[in-house]
Amino acid sequence: MARLNPSKPSSRGGKPRSSSADAMAEHKPLPGRPKREGEGASKRKAKSGGFESMGLCEEVYRGVRHKGYRVPTPIQRKAMPLILAGHDIAAMARTGSGKTAAFLVPMIQRLRRHDAGAGIRALILSPTRDLATQTLKFAQQLGKFTDLKISLIVGGDSMESQFEELAENPDIIIATPGRLVHHLAEVEDLNLRTVEYVVFDEADSLFSLGLIQQLHDILHKLSDTRQTLLFSATLPQALADFAKAGLRDPQIVRLDLDKKISPDLKLAFFTLRQEEKLAALLYLVRERISSEEQTIIFVSTKHHVEFLNILFREEGLEPSLSYGAMDQEARNIHISKFRARKTMILIVTDVAARGLDIPLLDNVVNWDFPAKPKLFVHRVGRVARQGRSGTAYTFVTSEDMAYLLDLHLFLSKPLRPAPTEEELLKDMEGMNLKIDRALANGETVYGRFPQTIIDLVSDGIKEVINGCTDLIALEKPCTNAFHLYLKTRPMPSTESIRRVKDLPREGLHPIFRDVLGSDELSALAFSERLKSFRPKQTILEAEGEAARGSNQWLDVMKKKREVHEGIINLVHQKNNVDHEPKEELVENISNWERKDVCGNKRKLQSFRDEEYYISSVPQNQHLEAGLSVRANEGFVENRLDAAVLDLVDDETSGMQAQKTRYHWKKNKFVKLNSGDRVTATGKIKTESGAKLKPTKTGIYKKWQQKTHRSIDTGRKFGGFAEEGASTTGSHQRGNRKHTAVGRGRRYIPNADVPSEIRNPEQIQKSRQQKAMDIARMKNRSTKESKFQKFQKNNRRHDGPLKDGKFQKNRRPDGNGKNRRPDGNGKGRGKGKGNANGFGKGKGKMKGKGTR
């Protein structure tokens, strides 16, 4: 009796038994050995976490095993059961996390075999032709043991070859939006109503390339019964709105990597000036970060990426780089070098790093502080994975302190400044012990960069910049781009802006405690005291005391200062003690001080029992504000809004596109969504950047006449229209339920009649066209009236015509001037001549010429 081969798939995911004897063999124990208790259960339990438990058919499971998959990735484990159940999905996963197989395996499982009469049943939209080609190869490998036909529709290939592929009735189309819209405009018979499975791959990139309008056009041509899947690395606001409109009760699938910071990640915040960032970055890369550790550096614009790339190469460091406008081939080369550990530094922007999955990173450097807390978590979430430790270094300027407070309110982590140099000189061991305890408790300590180190490194950087013409040429573009970045990034909360003014002065960061000695600490303490020095006397008082003269106004100023200093100290004390009960502050104020501060008004006193007190502000207020959760919307909308993350573009054109733009049709400035384009020609933009008009060019008809073939996917028969999801089953229209008849077709009255209802844009365009026609007719009538008047004045002209116009004969009577072609002008020339101007000779002639 045959035993089950452990290497073969289980009975649930593999091929079913063909005979009853083989089916009974599973339940009979082996002869000579009793079956151990729980033996079969242990085998099923060992494979319960793999693809065997997903109920895949034999062909699909063999393709998965042939590809080399054994255990599903986290995104596959979460998304595939929901997709197989028929739900719409909005999933957020980085590149390299296995998301391609997460939607390809359920698609092949659903289609299984080729159906020539069903039309196009699956559609996958990719932002670039490279990604579409990669998806095609992946789908062919997974569907190796099926007879499904897959067609690739991307720009750069000939339309005729793609017509031939579409004429073979493919089951799956992998396309870029620009070329697909071109096919829909060219081929009338190409119908997407039969599509039942739609995937928007790298949806955030689709929107950033300006393909929003094309995606909406494609979405309107699909059936309402389709299953829509949306995979993205991040979720911009425009993409969230698209998901609300295009997905039906979507399930939000996201990994927990972006929701929290790893406990093994160390945070280091350095306060410095903007011009000191170069020196601080070079010091960190050379001295603090090991050469065996991989580091990713986030900057704001592509100009900073190019500047740092040249600077590092001048300093003997070879980095990799990536930004949004970079060529795809060059970007892949740089990323491959970094993944292969040929380079240890990667300089990127937020737009280029979106969806980038690089395992085993050691350090992250934030050159510019992220404007949103979720963006900070998105950056540093790449470090300290899989039990490894890592460090996130962040440069903080004075303008970024409010963002620092917003971040720690979002993370619910306490923030404290590093002890000053004076405090360290008084009790260095006690302060160091205090800081170590704070760091062990999860608190964040921020401090200054040593000024001596910055001054030393800055001198070398200036010499390098002055000796490199490329760096000199990039300085001004970097400055201008950074100013534009500051204008376009979101503002911090007003509460954090107000609290920044009351923050105490920070000292040297604890990471540099071993770098400086006691003498250098004393020098730094002295310089900090000079910075904070404020004279206690006005210039008049100082001059009066220097003159050693008695002046009654000096005594008045001293008394005034004594009174006002007490009041000022009380106000500062009141502002600093916000969380203490008000009655404690009232008890500490004497009668005369209370009179000076509050006047004769009675002080409002309150009593608060901390055990039973319920605050009107929730404890997770800042977390909810950071996630932008709206309570007045549904649960799905809240989950989508909580995942929204808009990124500031890394180049000037993208930053300007995020601001208001002048709309040529509305004749006013409008706010555009991310990735929208305003074009006056009505052209569509393909993934290669080419602009095409979405109108017929006659290519399809020429191909039909040449090959005598046609594309009949999604055929229509008179009033019958193919109804999307499946060839059998039922559909619902209004409140009445109908059963599908005859090969999945149902009768729809007037299905081919175009709609006569025009939208406001069409009405406005027709009015403008009508006004232009009227103006053109008026202009034409004015020209005709002038021409008729000219003909009337020149009736007796019998001379030659040139280009349909009368020749102006300036000398009809010899050398005389005559501006009328009939010879009735005055002649002032010498010699004899007739009225036709053919005479020669000498003499004077005055008078009117006659014919």
UniProtKB/Swiss-Prot annotation:
Domain comment as written in the entry: The Q motif is unique to and characteristic of the DEAD box family of RNA helicases and controls ATP binding and hydrolysis.
Superkingdom, natural source: Eukaryota
SMART domains linked: DBP10CT, DEXDc, HELICc
Family: Belongs to the DEAD box helicase family. DDX54/DBP10 subfamily.
PANTHER family with a match to the protein in the record: ATP-DEPENDENT RNA HELICASE RHLE-RELATED, RNA HELICASE
Species of origin: Oryza sativa subsp. japonica (Rice)
Keyword Oxidoreductase carried by entry: no
Motif Q motif positions after renumbering to this chain: 49-77
Comp. bias intervals (Low complexity): 7-20
One Gene Ontology term, aspect cellular component: nucleolus
Ranges where the Helicase ATP-binding domain occurs: 80-253
Catalytic reaction equation(s): ATP + H2O = ADP + phosphate + H(+)
Alphabetically ordered keywords of this record: ATP-binding, Helicase, Hydrolase, Nucleotide-binding, RNA-binding
E.C. number: 3.6.4.13
GO molecular function: ATP binding; ATP hydrolysis activity; RNA binding; RNA helicase activity
Positions with biased composition (Basic and acidic residues): 24-42, 773-787, 796-825
Region of interest (Disordered), ranges: 1-49, 719-851
Motif (DEAD box) on chain: 201-204
Residues given in the record as ATP binding sites: 93-100
Biased composition (Basic residues): 733-746, 841-851
GO biological process per UniProt: rRNA processing
Protein's name according to its UniProt entry: DEAD-box ATP-dependent RNA helicase 29
Ranges where the Helicase C-terminal domain occurs: 277-426
